[in-house]
């Protein structure tokens, strides 16, 4: 596959430059309808954790945020931490996101924000690594970090529960942790021999390790 994010994979299928691609988001019904003999295979799941700096008092006082609180934080309606919880200090909330046109933000927008825009004061990080670095360096920062990156930085960032549910491989796979996106192989028509071999590889132990290395939780 060529890189270029999830949108590029679907676009290549739609305009016929590819008959097989990898996308890291749900495929819209309107897109499926335009692809001849549309097929999809789920090979992994990524979740977005709501991450703060471990020195932020919220990590000790309140390890959970509701979807509504997250929405108010990221929209800028809550400007200081004490608006989230009166026992927290009145320090300014620093919101960190990925670029607003990317796949990760699309998932966050859909699962949490709905029609509400993220504050224009948000720092847009060019990568998940850069997003996490901002949280590590700023005690008042909050951002959505993909599960794999959050695991790699355990101890340096703190992942809050969302609506009382912690992000774990179990809650992500069973769907009870809601801020998540699938890693899909999408195609048009029957798999060719080469495509089938690639699918078999992804479902093998080596392939599952590769999916984990990409920061996803493998799904057989």
Functional labels for PLM-detected ranges:
Residues 1-220:
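Exported/periplasmic ABC-transporter solute-binding proteins
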């Amino acid at each position: 596959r060529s890189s270029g994010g999830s949108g590029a994979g679907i676009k290549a299928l739609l305009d016929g430059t590819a008959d097989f691609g990898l996308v890291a988001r749900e495929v819209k019904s309107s897109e499926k309808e335009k692809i001849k003999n549309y097929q999809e295979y789920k090979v992994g799941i990524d979740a977005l954790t709501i991450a703060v700096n471990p020195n932020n008092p919220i990590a000790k006082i309140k390890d959970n945020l509701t979807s509504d609180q997250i929405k108010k934080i990221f929209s800028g309606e809550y400007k200081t931490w004490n608006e989230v919880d009166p026992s927290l200090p009145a320090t300014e909330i620093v919101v960190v996101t990925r670029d607003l046109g990317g796949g990760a933000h699309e998932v966050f927008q859909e699962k949490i924000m709905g029609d509400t825009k993220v504050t224009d004061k948000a720092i847009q990080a060019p990568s998940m690594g850069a997003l996490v670095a901002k949280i590590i360096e700023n005690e008042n920062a909050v951002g959505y970090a993909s599960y794999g990156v959050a695991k790699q930085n355990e101890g340096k960032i703190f992942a809050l529960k969302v609506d009382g549910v912690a992000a774990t491989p179990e809650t992500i796979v069973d769907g009870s942790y809601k801020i998540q996106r699938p890693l899909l192989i999408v195609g048009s028509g029957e798999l060719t021999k080469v495509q089938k071999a690639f699918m078999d590889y992804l479902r093998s132990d080596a392939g599952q390790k590769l999916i984990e290395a990409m920061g996803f939780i493998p799904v057989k």
